C-alpha cells in the first residue's frame, strides 16, 4: 500500500522516456506557472521509482501517465473540466509498443487540483495495480531555486575581434559591416524574415543605424555569432532581455530566455512596419545567404518601405536571446542578438549547459 509520494516538478516531457524529469524546475517556479495558466509537469514517485507523471495543460486540461516496473509510460488518462471545480476522466489509453488501446476509467471524476493538491490523482494509481492508502503524504523533493533566467554575461565580448576557444576547437572572431537599417516607425523589429508578423520590437527614434556582425571563423566554415544594431555612440551600462508585453521573466527556469524564433535559418533587423514577399525573400535573402562567404545581406527598401538587414542564424533554426543595451541614464544604445555559437562562462558552470528557450 502506498502511503507517501515524492513530488518533483519539471517542464513538459514530450517524447522523453526515463525515471526523472528531463528538465527539472523548482517548486516556486512551477507554482508561478500554475498561477499563470502555463504548462508544467509533476512527477509522483515512491522509493525512487516513478509511479505517475501529471501534466498541466492550458484551458484546464490535465493528463496523467502511469509507469510500469521498467519505468515506461504505459497508460495515459486525460481529464477535462467538468462542472464547477471538477475534472472528468474522459479517456483511458493503454500505450503498447506504439499502439494505443482505449478502455474505461474506473474512477470517473476528481477535484480540479490547486497547486500542490496532488492527492486528488492518487486513486488513479489503481489503474496500474498500485493501492493508495486512505491518506497519502506528499514529500517535496523538487530542485532548489536556481540562478534564474539567462543573464547577459559576455555580450560585449562577442564583438571583440581575436582568437576564441569554442566547443569545436580554436576559432577567430572577425567583425563585419552589414550596412545600416532604416527605421521610420520608431520600432526596430528583430524577426525571422519569413515570419515578420510576430517580431520582437524595441522602441527607437526614427533614423538609420549601423549593423555589425560578429563572425566566427573556423576552417572551413564562417558563422554569424552575434549581430548588433548601434543606436547611440555610447557604451552600455546595463543589459535587459527584449520582452513582449505578455512575457514575464519570473516564469522562466534557470538559464532559460525569451528569444526570437527562427524557422528559416535567418534573422533580420527591420522596421516593424516592413512587409516581405516570398519571392523577394527567396531571390534576395535566402539564395545569397546560402553561400558560405555571404553571412549578411540587405533587402533594399522601396518608395514606401524601409530596408531590411538579414543574416544567417548561428547553426540555424532555434531560438536566440535579444538583449537591449542601455546607457546609465536608461537610453537604449544598442540591440544585440546572441546566436549562441559557444556558451558564456556562466553557462559553462551550469550542469547540462544551455537551457531551453521560449520564442
What is each model feature region?
Residues 43, 53-54, 211-213, 227, ...:
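Generic structural hydrophobic/aromatic packing signal, biased to beta-strands
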Residues 115, 131-282:
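Extended, low-hydrophobicity segments enriched in charged/polar residues
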Residues 66-68, 79-82, 89-92, 188, ...:
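Surface-exposed beta-strand edges and their flanking turn/coil or helix-capping segments
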Amino acid at each position: 500500500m502506498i502511503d507517501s509520494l515524492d513530488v518533483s516538478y519539471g517542464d513538459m516531457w514530450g517524447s522523453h522516456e526515463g525515471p526523472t524529469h528531463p528538465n527539472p524546475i523548482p517548486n516556486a517556479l512551477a507554482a508561478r506557472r500554475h498561477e499563470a495558466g502555463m504548462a508544467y509537469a509533476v512527477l509522483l514517485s515512491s522509493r525512487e521509482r516513478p509511479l505517475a507523471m501529471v501534466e498541466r495543460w492550458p484551458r484546464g486540461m490535465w493528463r496523467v501517465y502511469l509507469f510500469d516496473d521498467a519505468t515506461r509510460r504505459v497508460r495515459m488518462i486525460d481529464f477535462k473540466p467538468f462542472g464547477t471545480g471538477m475534472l472528468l476522466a474522459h479517456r483511458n489509453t493503454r500505450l503498447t509498443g506504439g499502439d494505443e488501446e482505449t478502455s474505461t476509467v474506473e474512477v470517473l471524476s476528481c477535484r480540479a487540483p490547486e497547486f500542490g493538491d496532488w492527492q486528488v490523482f492518487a486513486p488513479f494509481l489503481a489503474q496500474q495495480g498500485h493501492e493508495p492508502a486512505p491518506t497519502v503524504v506528499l514529500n517535496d523533493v523538487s530542485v532548489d531555486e536556481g540562478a534564474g533566467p539567462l543573464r547577459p554575461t559576455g555580450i560585449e565580448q562577442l564583438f571583440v575581434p581575436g582568437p576564441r576557444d569554442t566547443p569545436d576547437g580554436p576559432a577567430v572572431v572577425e567583425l563585419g559591416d552589414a550596412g545600416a537599417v532604416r527605421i521610420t516607425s520608431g520600432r526596430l523589429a528583430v524577426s525571422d524574415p519569413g515570419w515578420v508578423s510576430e517580431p520582437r520590437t524595441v522602441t527607437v527614434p526614427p533614423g538609420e543605424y549601423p549593423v555589425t556582425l560578429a563572425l566566427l571563423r573556423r576552417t572551413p566554415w564562417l558563422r554569424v555569432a552575434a549581430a548588433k544594431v548601434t543606436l547611440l555612440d555610447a557604451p552600455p551600462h546595463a543589459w535587459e532581455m527584449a520582452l513582449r508585453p505578455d512575457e514575464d521573466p519570473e516564469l522562466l527556469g534557470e538559464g532559460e530566455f525569451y528569444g526570437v524564433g527562427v524557422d528559416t535559418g535567418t534573422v533580420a533587423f527591420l522596421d516593424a512596419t516592413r512587409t516581405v514577399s516570398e519571392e523577394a525573400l527567396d531571390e534576395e535573402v535566402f539564395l545569397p545567404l546560402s553561400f558560405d562567404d555571404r553571412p549578411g545581406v540587405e533587402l533594399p527598401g522601396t518608395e514606401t518601405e524601409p530596408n531590411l538587414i538579414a543574416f544567417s542564424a548561428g547553426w540555424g533554426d532555434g531560438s536566440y536571446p535579444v538583449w537591449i543595451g542601455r546607457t546609465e541614464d536608461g537610453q537604449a544604445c544598442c540591440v544585440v542578438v546572441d546566436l549562441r555559437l559557444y556558451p558564456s562562462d556562466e553557462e559553462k558552470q551550469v550542469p547540462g549547459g544551455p537551457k531551453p528557450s521560449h520564442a
